[in-house]
Amino acid sequence: MDWEEYKKWGKKGIDWGYDYRKNLRKLPVRSQLNPGDVFNKIPNEPPEKPEKIEKIINDFEQLIMPGITHWQHPRFFSYFPSNAAPSSVLAEIFTNTMSPMCMLWQTSPAATELEEKIIDWFKISLGLPMGFNGVIQDSATSATLSAVLTMREKALNRSGNQKGLFNQ
C-alpha cells in the first residue's frame, strides 16, 4: 500500500468505524461462533503474493467481525471500556502514523514534555500538591500488582525486595 491508497482506504476506514459504532447496539455482544470456526477458515499456507486490500477488508468483515466480542457494546459489562472514545480513536491515527518511540526525552521531546504537563493538570484537577509524584499504570492488572507490591513493602518495613518474605 502506498500513501495514496492509505488516504483512500483511511477515509473508508473512518467511515467504517463511524458506522460500526453507530450500529453497535444491533450486534450481539459476544461472538456466536464455536471454537475453531475462524481458525478453520483461514488458509493453512500464507498467500504467495500480497492480497488486494479489498480482499483483506472483505475477509475482515466476513471472517473476523463475526468472531469478535464487542467490548465497546452498550451491553458489555466486563472490564473497563474506556479507551475508544472518538477522540481516542482519532489520536491513535495521529500517533500510529508517526509511530514515535517515546521512552525518553531524547527520543521524543514533545511527547515527554506533553506527558509532564498533562500530569501537572491531573495534579491540579485532583487537588494534589505540585510536588506530588506517582505513576499512572497502563492496566488494572499492573495497578493491582503495583498496589500489592507497595503493601508488601510497607508491611515488611521496606525490606521485602532485599530479604524476601522469609528474610532470606
Positions of the model-derived regions?
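Short, intrinsically disordered, charge-balanced linker/junction segments flanking boundaries
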Residues: 159-168
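N-terminal entrance/gating region of PLP-dependent enzymes' catalytic architecture
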Residues: 1-131
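Conserved beta-loop-alpha segment that forms the PLP phosphate-binding cup at the N-terminus of a helix
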Residues: 115, 119, 133-160
